């Protein structure tokens, strides 16, 4: 055992042991409590960054701790391998996306191995492998057969240069992020999955997720956006269809002075067909992508269509406007405007000099309608038969009136829209559908799955390469045998990441999407990832789990029992990025200090949920601590080996009750730290675990070894320390555990038990304050009387109370504090 801590040698030795013993490969065991720990799998970008190191170390620490508790732990790893970066790399570097992806996976896997994470590598999966996405295609067809999948025209962001759909995030200042072209709003045919059919369950089952952050659950509630309101029907002059609008405030219906529709609403297009000015307005809105978050601050613009609607109660005509603040994707794409009681409608009315009709009277306050809208509830006025009703009552009465007159109905509305899964890209899972002129849409037969991406394609950067690949596109209809074409869209990559956690449980299953192993392992007991995934990925995964449940593939309602959302890694107060020049390279860190130092620092520097501020001095401090632990263990190696031999031979019993006072006191501290650290591990508060380990080490390194009992105490304490540190710094703990003669490998050692008798103490440390200021401290017996404690306090604080009158002595037992109040 070398006196000098060499992390590279230590870590190589530990990793070779784990690899040789297949230490982290796991199978189902009904005799053990299972624990499935999973960090969100990475996109293979080519290199790990410090955010990765923090995220995956968190998961590994949790998995190793749960294993030490005796549970059957699964911790897999894989690759979210489809996506736009690989396709862009293919265009730029003239290499196939698959080649670029495989190269990146190999590089990142090497980095993961160096970190020492306890992964079951036999379960490794890659979403771009046909054996993975085959079952995604199979499941999509099952959903199609159930009516949960459909294809329809939808308005999208279209890049006319790249000839592809862009996500909202890829539109920068109205231009395509790559081509720089002005983005158009274009209607094309898209595939959708009916997530709205599960909206109510997705919302209600959030209440069962007790171990999810409240913030994430609220974000999902807001995204689903359930509201109870009224659907109102307006007849339109010279137009065949009624205009449907949704409102949560039917009590303001009598104050509606105009209607507004979205720029891509069918009625707007109808008006534009014979009104040049309306068409010009629609054209001016074509390249503008309006995000919902921008509605409050953007300039409100519109134009009168010249068409009118009939108020369902008064029969009066209301002008219909096209407005840029009405979005087709929310509600029905039409709103009734009540300027007196909606601020957005009021601003629009002021700009275009439209009428403002007050129909709600504030209760006990005055309001100036020339300055703003009044948006709260009140008493109805100017509302004919509904006058003098409170808003709460009027909502019900007016809704009933509309229902009785076939002019509306009570309804529940959701902000959530069906999930559009089509992407006009190559590097994704092919959608397994065939389009036949005679038969329509026909699923690819199961026996022909997977539909594999062709390799003989050209990456020009314009349009989808699949559309130009005749061998891929031209097929025979499986239903009628006539010539047909294959669907050339690929899946949104969120589809792959919505079910991968379940496939990890069934790796190697070639004949089914999932098997009974998925029912054993799911739900995931602990899921770890960034809060930026709160809505999209986490919502889609919850949805997919319910779809798989209803197909009989899993038997739980939710995919992830507990969720930990880690904070970002910052340097100089900013997120690490190449452009800011504040990136820390994990490879350099591991080469210099070792993986254990990197792991220790990222666990110690901050609670998991908070941002971590990088500190070079903090890294050096973590490394110094590990060197001290190594040196101390080396210094006492022979003694510790002898004690181990005594214990293994049955001669290592110590009666701690008969030990001397100083040993009892130190042992009390060690077991106090053990109890607190175990509690902190259970709450994922690893920074305080590390702090406790440092206190424990200081206690034993300062302890004077004088008796045989002292040796057993040091042995017991180092055993506890190494097991407390092992989930966080597994390599050094593995080597020290073996070299100090402990039984088994430390990964198979049970979690240390708190000796409750050690927590009991004969003595208590008290601090003495004089007029609230700390002046002294002393040790007293646990059964000391109040009089004895006060006398001891006076004695130890003598210099501060002499020549003063002690007016009062206050004892605070739970804080072990005595405050002497002097005059």
UniProtKB/Swiss-Prot annotation:
Protein name: Leucine--tRNA ligase
Subcellular location: Cytoplasm
Swiss-Prot/TrEMBL keywords: Aminoacyl-tRNA synthetase, ATP-binding, Cytoplasm, Ligase, Nucleotide-binding, Protein biosynthesis
CDD domains xrefs: Anticodon_Ia_Leu_BEm, LeuRS_core
EC number: 6.1.1.4
Domain of life: Bacteria
Entry-linked PANTHER family: LEUCINE--TRNA LIGASE, MITOCHONDRIAL, LEUCYL-TRNA SYNTHETASE
HAMAP family noted in UniProt: Leu_tRNA_synth_B
Catalytic activity: tRNA(Leu) + L-leucine + ATP = L-leucyl-tRNA(Leu) + AMP + diphosphate
Organism of this sequence: Legionella pneumophila (strain Corby)
Predominant location: cytoplasm
Record gene name: leuS
An example Gene Ontology CC term for this record: cytosol
Family under the similarity heading: Belongs to the class-I aminoacyl-tRNA synthetase family.
Residue span of motif 'KMSKS' region: 575-579
List of residues binding ATP: 578
Family annotation (SUPFAM superfamilies): Anticodon-binding domain of a subclass of class I aminoacyl-tRNA synthetases (SSF47323), Nucleotidylyl transferase (SSF52374), ValRS/IleRS/LeuRS editing domain (SSF50677)
GO molecular function, a single term: leucine-tRNA ligase activity
């Amino acid at each position: 055992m070398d006196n000098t801590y060499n992390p590279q040698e230590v870590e190589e030795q530990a990793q070779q042991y784990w690899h040789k013993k297949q230490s982290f490969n796991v199978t189902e065991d009904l005799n053990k409590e299972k624990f499935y720990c999973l960090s969100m799998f990475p996109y293979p970008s080519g290199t790990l960054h410090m955010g990765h190191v923090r995220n995956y170390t968190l998961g590994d620490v949790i998995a190793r701790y749960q294993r030490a508790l005796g549970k059957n732990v699964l911790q897999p790893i894989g690759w979210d391998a489809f996506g736009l970066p690989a396709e862009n790399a293919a265009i730029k570097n003239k290499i196939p996306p698959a080649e670029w992806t495989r190269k990146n996976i190999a590089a990142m896997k090497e980095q993961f191995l160096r970190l020492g994470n306890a992964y079951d590598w036999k379960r490794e999966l890659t979403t771009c492998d046909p054996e993975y996405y085959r079952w995604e295609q199979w499941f999509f067809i099952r959903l199609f057969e159930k009516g949960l999948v459909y294809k329809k025209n939808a308005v999208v962001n279209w890049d006319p240069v790249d000839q592809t759909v862009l996500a909202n995030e890829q539109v920068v200042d109205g231009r395509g992020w790559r081509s720089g072209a002005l983005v158009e709003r274009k209607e094309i045919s898209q595939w959708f999955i009916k997530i709205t059919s599960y909206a109510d369950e997705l919302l209600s089952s959030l209440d069962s997720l007790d171990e999810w952050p409240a913030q994430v659950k609220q974000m999902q509630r807001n995204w689903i956006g359930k509201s109870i309101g009224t659907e109102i029907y307006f007849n339109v002059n010279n137009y065949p269809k009624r205009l449907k609008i949704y409102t949560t405030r039917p009590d303001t219906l009598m104050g509606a002075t105009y209607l507004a529709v979205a720029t891509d609403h069918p009625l707007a297009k109808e008006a534009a067909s014979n009104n040049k000015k309306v068409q010009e307005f629609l054209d001016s809105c074509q390249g503008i992508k309006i995000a919902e978050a921008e509605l409050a601050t953007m300039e409100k613009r519109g134009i009168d269509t010249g068409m009118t609607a009939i108020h369902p109660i008064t029969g009066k005509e209301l002008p219909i406007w096209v407005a840029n603040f009405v979005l087709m994707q929310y509600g029905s794409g039409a709103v009734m405007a009540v300027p007196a009681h909606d601020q957005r409608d009021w601003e629009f009315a002021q700009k275009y000099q439209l009428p403002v009709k007050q129909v709600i009277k504030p209760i006990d306050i005055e309001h100036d309608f020339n300055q703003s809208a009044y948006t709260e509830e009140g008493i109805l006025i100017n509302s004919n038969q509904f006058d003098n009703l409170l808003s709460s009552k009027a909502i019900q009465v007016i809704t009933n009136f509309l229902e009785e007159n076939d002019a509306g109905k009570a309804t529940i509305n959701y902000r959530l829209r069906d999930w559009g899964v089509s992407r006009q890209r190559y590097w994704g899972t092919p959608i397994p559908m065939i389009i036949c002129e005679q038969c329509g849409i026909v699923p690819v037969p199961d026996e022909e799955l997977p539909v594999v991406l062709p390799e003989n394609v050209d990456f020009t950067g314009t349009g989808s390469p699949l559309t130009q690949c005749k061998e891929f596109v031209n097929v025979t209809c499986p239903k009628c045998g006539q010539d047909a074409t294959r669907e050339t869209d690929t899946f949104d990559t969120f589809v792959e990441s919505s079910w991968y956690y379940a496939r990890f449980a069934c790796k190697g299953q070639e004949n089914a999407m999932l098997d009974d192993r998925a029912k054993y392992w799911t739900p995931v007991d602990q899921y770890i990832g960034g809060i930026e995934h709160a809505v999209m990925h986490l919502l889609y995964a919850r949805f997919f789990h319910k779809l798989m449940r209803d197909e009989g593939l899993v038997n739980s309602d939710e995919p992830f029992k507990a969720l930990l959302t880690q904070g970002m890694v910052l340097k100089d107060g900013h997120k690490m990025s190449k452009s800011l020049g504040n990136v820390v390279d994990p490879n350099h860190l591991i080469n210099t200090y070792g993986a254990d130092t990197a792991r220790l620092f990222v666990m110690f520097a901050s609670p998991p949920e908070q941002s971590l501020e990088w500190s070079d001095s903090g890294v050096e401090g973590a490394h110094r601590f590990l060197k001290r632990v190594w040196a101390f263990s080396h210094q006492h190696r022979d003694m510790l080996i002898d004690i181990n031999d005594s214990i293994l031979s049955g001669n290592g019993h110590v009666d701690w009750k008969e030990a001397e006072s100083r040993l009892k006191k130190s042992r009390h501290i060690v077991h106090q730290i053990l109890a607190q650290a175990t509690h902190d591990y259970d709450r994922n508060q690893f920074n305080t675990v590390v702090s406790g380990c440092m206190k424990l080490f200081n206690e034993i390194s300062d302890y004077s070894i004088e008796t045989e009992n002292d040796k057993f105490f040091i042995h017991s304490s180092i055993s506890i320390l190494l097991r407390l540190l092992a989930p966080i710094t597994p390599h050094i703990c593995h080597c020290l555990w073996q070299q100090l003669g402990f039984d088994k490998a430390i990964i198979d050692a049970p979690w240390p038990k708190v000796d409750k008798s050690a927590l009991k103490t004969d003595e208590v440390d008290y601090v003495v304050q004089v007029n609230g200021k700390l002046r002294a401290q002393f040790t007293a017996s646990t059964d000391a009387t109040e009089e004895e404690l006060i006398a001891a306090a006076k004695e130890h604080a003598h210099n501060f109370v002499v020549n003063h009158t002690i007016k009062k002595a206050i004892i605070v037992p739970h804080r072990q504090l005595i405050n002497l109040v002097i005059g």
